[in-house]
Amino acid sequence: MALPYHIFLFTVLLPSFTLTAPPPCRCMTSSSPYQEFLWRMHHPGNIDAPSYRSFSKGTPTFTAHTHMPRNCYNSATLCMHGNTHYWTGKMINPSCPGGLGVTVCWTYFTHTGMSDGGGVQDEAREKHVKEVISQLTQVHSTSSPYKGLDLSKLHETLRTHTRLVSLFNTTLTGLHEVSAQNPTNCWMCLPLAFRPYVSIPVPEQWNNFSTEINTTSVLVGPLVSNLEITHTSNLTCVKFSNTTNTTNSQCIRWVTPPTQVVCLPSGIFFVCGTSAYRCLNGSSESMCFLSFLVPPMTIYTEQDLYNYVVSKPRNKRVPILPFVMAAGVLGALGTGIGGITTSTQFYYKLSQELNGDMERVADSLVTLQDQLNSIAAVVLQNRRALDLLTAERGGTCLFLGEECCYYVNQSGIVTEKVKEIRDRIQRRAEELRNIGPWGLFSQWMPWILPFLGPLAAIILLLLFGPCIFNLLVNFVSSRIEAVKLQMEPKMQSKTKIYHRPLDWPASPRSDVNDIKGTPPEEISTAQPLLRPNSAGSS
């Protein structure tokens, strides 16, 4: 998990410390290695740099680490540099930063998403997260669900900063210059939750590096992780003392830093693996190259965003901003062809805007992701609470789910547009709150009417169908009985019934079942009946 992306993160309230100010931090280094590294970057063909003493002595620079494992120190105390609190302690392990017995400084919080193993950085973060959750649990929902939650405390935390306005204006200018789509009126949204930064490697032909160190603080360690790397060819790679493979086909240019801690100019970062660094200590286990960093953004048209907020969410979204420009920009950066000046300058300026936020990482006390998780776990009771937050509170940012959106046109950010859509959302919410039973029925009538006819037919069929079926069955049965009665006399007229006495002797030549025999009635009338008694008396 990496750092969230916009400056909302860096405007959170600082923790409350005791009234007694901590002592000043004493972790200073010289800027000479930085100047030597700049010389090597401008003279990549020269193996031997001028004598180290020929460089200016440099100004003392405060150095702090972004991560310090718990097993590197026995105890840590607070110190202060530039109105910012740091931890300081003596190293007890030779493999720790600085080495055995060296006193070093590290940031109040560790690199986001990492743990120091139960040390002072973890304790500080846990303490602040509890404070944030305690504040959020005091926020409660009132009246109708469409009003959502009173997240005024969160909104104060996420107030717009001038750096964000500058970041958007820079992005919009570059988008107009290098994008084929060239959007003129749209909503540009920055994520509140985690989404990877995008790494744009510095092209070989570009040498517009700053020649002066412009920071009084050096943060040694990763500033952001889980980068989205656009391409891995034609890279400007860094050769350290322990680098063995200098024939990597991905690298088209090599630069060699000194062994001391070295920092890059504002807007340029070391990318080692999937992590970005501002400063390195002269060694790295993985291959490192120079890169710009740009924030991820989502772009909506006016209608798409209104449909998303007012009606129902839609899954269709345009690509993240850097990939909107991919066809015209990344191809040029990758092949090294001409026409890259405009796009490279854009990415450099955008990366510088981002760098201003990176340097404030030590001032941020908790990531916005932690706050969002706290809201979801404690008080976020309906999905549309953040969507409707701007209908209840002021601000120039329109909260859309887990994104913060700004309306932009050719002139830059238009804050009035946020108020306009906020009013539309508020009117829509009022309509939903004030709607009565008959009003709700009238709203559903256009959807119900097409189904009323078939539905009524089905109901009538279920009610009267059995009766109609029984009537049909009875009618058919009566007709069948009538036909049977008409056919019965004709059948009887064609049938003869024969009778004979029970003691009539069976004739060997005649039988009652023999159709060729003589019927008993006809025999009795044709000849006298012979009886056995009369024959014996004669």
Curated annotation (Swiss-Prot):
Looking at the UniProt record, the site noted as Cleavage sits at R317, V318
Q: Which domain of life is it from?
A: Eukaryota
Please give the SUPFAM superfamilies that the UniProt record associates with this protein: Virus ectodomain (SSF58069)
InterPro entries given in the database record: TLV/ENV_coat_polyprotein
**Record GO cellular component, one term:** plasma membrane
Residues of the region (Immunosuppression) are 380-396
* Residues carrying a glycan: N169, N208, N214, N234, N242, N245, N281, N409
Gene3D superfamilies, sorted: 1.10.287.210
Q: Which GO terms describe its biological process?
A: syncytium formation; syncytium formation by plasma membrane fusion
Q: List the disulfide bonds.
A: C186-C189, C186-C405, C397-C404
Q: Region labeled Essential for the fusiogenic function — which residues?
A: 465-484
From the record, which residues define motif CX6CC? 397-405
Give residue ranges on the Cytoplasmic side. 465-538
Q: Which Pfam families match?
A: TLV_coat (PF00429)
PTM annotation: Specific enzymatic cleavages in vivo yield mature proteins. Envelope glycoproteins are synthesized as an inactive precursor that is heavily N-glycosylated and processed likely by furin in the Golgi to yield the mature SU and TM proteins. The cleavage site between SU and TM requires the minimal sequence [KR]-X-[KR]-R. The CXXC motif is highly conserved across a broad range of retroviral envelope proteins. It is thought to participate in the formation of a labile disulfide bond possibly with the CX6CC motif present in the transmembrane protein.
Instruction: Please share what else the UniProt entry notes about this protein.
Output: Ortholog of the human HERV-W_7q21.2 envelope protein.
What is its quaternary makeup? The mature envelope protein (Env) consists of a trimer of SU-TM heterodimers attached probably by a labile interchain disulfide bond. Interacts with the C-type lectin CD209/DC-SIGN.
**Domain remark in the UniProt entry:** The cytoplasmic region is essential for the fusiogenic function.
Its function? This endogenous retroviral envelope protein has retained its original fusogenic properties and participates in trophoblast fusion and the formation of a syncytium during placenta morphogenesis. May recognize and induce fusion through binding of SLC1A4 and SLC1A5. Endogenous envelope proteins may have kept, lost or modified their original function during evolution. Retroviral envelope proteins mediate receptor recognition and membrane fusion during early infection. The surface protein (SU) mediates receptor recognition, while the transmembrane protein (TM) acts as a class I viral fusion protein. The protein may have at least 3 conformational states: pre-fusion native state, pre-hairpin intermediate state, and post-fusion hairpin state.
The record's PANTHER family line, in alphabetical order, gives:
SYNCYTIN-1, VIRAL ENVELOPE PROTEIN
Q: Which family does it belong to?
A: Belongs to the gamma type-C retroviral envelope protein family. HERV class-I W env subfamily.
Listed name of the protein? Syncytin-1
